[in-house]
A protein has these predicted regions:
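Glycine-centered hinge/linker elements that transmit conformational signals in sensory
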Residues: 86-91, 125-155
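C-terminal capping/gating helix-and-loop segments adjacent to ligand/active sites or protein-protein/ligand interfaces
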Residues: 270-327
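Hinge/lid segment of periplasmic solute-binding proteins
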Residues: 2-57, 191-193, 263, 277
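Extracytoplasmic/periplasmic substrate-recognition and gating elements
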Residues: 144, 184-253
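Alpha-to-beta junction loops
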Residues: 1, 9, 166-175
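Short, solvent-exposed loop/beta-turn-alpha elements that line the ligand-binding surface or hinge
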Residues: 14-31, 77-78, 95, 119-137, ...
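A ligand-binding cleft/hinge motif common to bilobed small-molecule-binding domains
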Residues: 2-5, 176-188
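Short helix-initiation/N-cap motifs at beta->coil->alpha
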Residues: 80-84, 152-165
Length: 335
């Protein structure tokens, strides 16, 4: 979920968190996943407007049987670059007649690839980073690979878990929490790998998910009760149970030591176990998008424009850059 730039309607939890009696400062410092809590304190020191409830990142889902049929192994997926993935994907199209790769989220495709060069899609101060050489370069790459049939976009399928389940695409990049929508009927083995990145660029893997907030328009007693509920909901056992039953990642490191998580990781047939291991490793490259006004609207624009450009509806890269920048600017300025 996208955080809004407007936070005054939610309570600053710092006074509770730092309290000697009921606080959880040490837990947040030592046990919560740092990148999950950073997102909720991005407004400055001693300004914490919520705590993470569930978080996901993105992973690469691969049809292992088809991959091997093409002459590759899962070793080829280690530290995978888009350049290598394009080679594999073109072979999938040429030999199997299916696309080799797609992004489940076209907005994440643009935002994460832009972040590989250290740029935020829209900065907290409202600066839009679409008009640059890196955006032009990777968008032209994705267009070329989509036009050749190696890559594809979601389109009318809405999500790529459907085509993947039906073996109509070799691999896709999607949420670590989306595996429940994959139904392969045991017809093929699923491999899970870290998402690809461009050669020579930084890895950038988005983190998303729900957080818990307390509103300002309730009594002090109600706010404190809500804070105690947040503590309860995010304790080690509860974050482990909630995460493993929904496919999300626990928000505490200590969850890995619970029987709930241990049992799943020990189960070699568990797809969640494969995802957990990859996603947990990916967190060292995780980032979050800055909280901006009308964030979801801006995402919708880049989603639509990305797909229009790579599919060929928008034919010129400068038209894509200029139109997208203009529409995003209008969107984030709208009150």
């Amino acid at each position: 979920s996208e955080l809004s730039a407007s936070v005054p309607t939610t309570a600053n939890l710092s006074s509770y968190i730092n309290d000697d009696t009921v606080g959880m400062k040490d837990d947040i410092k030592n046990d919560f996943i740092p990148d999950f809590t950073k997102e909720l304190s991005q407004w400055g020191e001693n300004k914490v407007y919520g705590l993470p409830m569930t978080k996901s990142t993105e992973v690469l889902y691969v049809n292992k049987n088809l991959l091997e049929q093409l002459g590759y192994t899962t070793d080829d997926l280690k530290d995978l670059t888009f350049e290598k993935l394009a080679e594999i994907s073109q072979k999938a199209y040429d030999e199997l007649g299916i696309a080799g790769f797609g992004f489940d989220s076209s907005s994440n495709a643009f935002i994460s690839t832009l972040k590989e060069d250290g740029k935020d899609f829209v900065q907290m101060d409202g600066k839009i980073n679409i008009q640059n050489d890196w955006a032009k370069k990777f968008m032209q790459f994705f267009r070329e690979k989509t036009q050749s049939g190696a890559f594809r976009v979601v389109g009318e399928d809405k999500f790529l878990s459907g085509p993947f389940s039906n073996q109509k695409i070799l691999s896709y990049q999607g949420s670590s929490a989306g595996f429940a929508h994959i139904n392969n009927n045991d017809e093929f083995e699923i491999a899970v790998a870290e998402v690809p990145h461009f050669e020579g660029k930084d890895k950038a893997i988005i983190q998303q998910g729900a957080s818990l907030f307390i509103t300002n328009n309730v009594s002090a007693e109600q706010q404190y009760a809500a804070y105690e509920f947040i503590k309860f909901a995010t304790n080690t056992e509860n974050t482990a149970k909630f995460a493993t039953s929904t496919g999300y990642l626990p928000v505490r490191k200590s969850a890995q030591d619970t029987d709930t998580v241990k049992n799943l990781l020990a189960d070699s047939t568990s797809l969640y176990g494969k995802i957990y291991n990859v996603a947990s490793e990916s967190l060292k490259f995780a980032y979050f998008t800055p909280a901006i006004n009308n964030a979801q609207s801006a995402r919708n624009i880049i989603q639509e424009k990305y797909e229009s450009y790579v599919n060929g509806s928008i034919t010129d890269i400068d038209t894509f850059i200029n139109d997208t920048t203009s529409q995003v600017k209008t969107s984030i300025q709208r009150q």
